[in-house]
């Protein structure tokens, strides 16, 4: 993932300990997340717990699934980093925020608040899932099965991961011509799909 991120997107990825991620629902649970990407000042920090990533995975080969999870997390970092002043040297952007939340955002604090609300969580997951689906379709012979597995996982998941509408669009959209074009391709799917936030 480090080489892939740098070669295609100029992003630096740091790999952190699988036990450094915390899930925060109603209580804070250490080591409970499957994967998480923090956005650091100029880099992406990936936490990946392979045991948790593979919970519920029923396919024969786990490697493409794990690659897809890592690429999904990279998409989160690429998405949010475009909005951050430390990455862009300009004012705060709103591309990673749900359209209804973006119009209310003028400060970094408001941006961070909007990022924690459900519409923006779904908006961000839609991009990351579309990005992963495109990656699988461009690289994996068993992409159709991986996409079906992702749809099954999302159908039984939490509200923030209700992205099957976008996954369906990504599964049938004409693919980009190269990996560097994958992020704008996923952006276009997220923006054009008639899906509910």
Predicted segment positions?
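Post-HEXXH active-site segment of zinc metalloproteases
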Residues: 80-125
